[in-house]
Amino acid sequence: MPNYGSLHSPSLRKMEQSRIQYGRKRLSLGNIIGDPFALATISIAFLAWIISFFGSLFAHINQPPNTPGVNNSFPLYTWWAVVFYFFLVVGVFIVVASDSVQTYHVAIVGYLGCGLVLSTSAVHGLIYSNIGSREAAAAGMILLAMVTIVWIFYFGSAPSAVPRAYIDSFALAKESSTNRQTMNTGYGIGRPETSTSVQPPQMYTAQLNGLENPSPVGGMQSSGMRNSAVPPPFQSTLGQKSNGLPGSSDGDIAPPTEYPYRAKAIYSYEANPEDANEISFQKHEILEVSDVSGRWWQARKENGDTGIAPSNYLILL
């Protein structure tokens, strides 16, 4: 059995290729035009910012004089909200266009939270005025606040969340092979796995009497196993890939007989031609799954083809 650090492992080559492509991302309008959610929300945000900017500009120029007991001066902190949202919307545009959402989503959510506070404060200072320009600026800030709330929910949710996975299923740009390799084939780089299990069940037989090896690495065996005449349990390639570790693809895996789970593909996947155990599938295709532990699931297609599939391309039904 080749060790886990073998340079000939297809999985390690995937990881290395993912690291190389990670630094080559360029801005592409196709990532926005091909994503209806990003196109709609960014367009509304830019339009709302333009309304807020010109409304605030005319309200600041044409502000009426103060009367006794009434302060009619324009709230200057509104300009800080306008400037902040300009860079915020541009930043979201750049992140989505460069397909770097999984890299910067935490920072985006933090900035969106600050922007929501600023926009609601600006609305409070403008909405109660009877001046048309201030009301227009307040309307723009309200639209920005609404888009911000939607963005916080989207960017703050895991890619495996049902609402976000449903929204991402309409994005055509996420179908490119470059995005699939960068986001998912790096075993932890990009979209997280949909299963929280990190270790498959241990193999136990009555003949071993509790002396089986609990370690996933074959070279680290317990003293009881070394002193026993019974050979260690066989660990297949499937068990290694279930733990997210690259394994050997020398032999085929005997498929299980039961597939109690059903999963839907949220991305298309092309099997590695050097690994006979992987299976290809198309977006929105329904697969039957036998085991949902680990990053690789044993799956069966409707035509009867069986193999292993990356769990972060699938969502359980």
Swiss-Prot record:
Entry-linked CDD domains = SH3_Sho1p
The alphabetized list of GO BP terms reads:
regulation of actin filament polymerization
Q: Name one GO cellular component term.
A: plasma membrane
Q: Which InterPro entries match?
A: SH3-like_dom_sf, SH3_domain, Sho1_SH3
UniProt keyword terms in alphabetical order: Cell membrane, Glycoprotein, Membrane, SH3 domain, Stress response, Transmembrane, Transmembrane helix
Segments traversing the membrane: 37-57, 76-96, 107-127, 136-156
Q: Which residues are glycosylated?
A: 71
What's the short name of a Pfam family annotated to this entry? Answer: SH3_1
The membrane topology of this protein is: Multi-pass membrane protein
Q: List the disulfide bonds.
A: none
**Which region ranges are annotated with the description Disordered?**
207-257
Q: Give the Gene3D superfamilies listed for this entry.
A: SH3 Domains
| Protein purpose | Plasma membrane osmosensor that activates the high osmolarity glycerol (HOG) MAPK signaling pathway in response to high osmolarity.
Quaternary arrangement and interactors, per the entry? Answer: Forms homooligomers.
- The protein's name is High osmolarity signaling protein SHO1
Higher taxonomy: Eukaryota, Fungi, Dikarya, Ascomycota, Pezizomycotina
